[in-house]
Amino acid sequence: MGYVGNALTVSNTADIFRERGQAVPLAELVRKTVRRAVLAYSLYNRRKKTHFILRFLAEQGVRDVLLVGATGDENGENPNLANSGVIEKCIAEHYPVRMGINIEPAITTYPFMIADARALPFADDYVDFALANAIIEHVGQECDQRRMVEEMTRVARTWIITTPNKWFPVESHTSTLFLHWIPAWRKDHEKDFTRLLSRREFRALLPRTAKLSGGLLSPTFTACYVR
């Protein structure tokens, strides 16, 4: 089947396009295009979130910070993770970071330790502010996510937790369209995330006094808490 009169034929070979002089399957070209768009939007969104977080910190008179799920320069050579750590680096430039934690090593300019967000190794009221930017969808199932929120509430006077919206058409971790709405596909990608959240599911994890922003179709939800 094809548009012969326009010299365009749709056939098995129509799945091949050219990118920078090399043959690229259509599916791969689409994936790369979506990925570039996701990365560009991700950088825009992270900068927007950074301004919001810095304004929140100033309003609350924050003295020091705990970064939950901190990343540093270890991903600098990976173009797919080029935007990771943007928010954390900016916060570290403006506020003292008392500690950054992750379950994997990170190269940071501030103190860092391996730790689990579900069992933070800190005393009550350890820090003035804690941030978990797009971390809660990685820590496990509902009970694990709830425990993470409880731990952040225990160790910090104020916190911000952000997470991607499960019902946004683009899945930011894998740069796919709509597939993350299929339970079987999500199960196969548990290495990328464990439990994506809707607004209702996220709200159910939070303290009653926490404020949640982001509409039903927003790409990201942001929760703010002040004790």
Give the positions of each predicted feature.
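Hydrophobic beta-strand segment of the Class I
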Residues: 130-131
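Short alpha-helix
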Residues: 188-209
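Hydrophobic adenine-recognition pocket in adenosine-nucleotide-binding enzymes
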Residues: 135
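Conserved S-adenosyl-L-methionine
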Residues: 209-220
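Alpha-helix C-terminal capping/helix-to-coil transition sites in glycosyltransferase folds
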Residues: 123-126, 154-155
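Conserved class I S-adenosyl-L-methionine
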Residues: 158-183
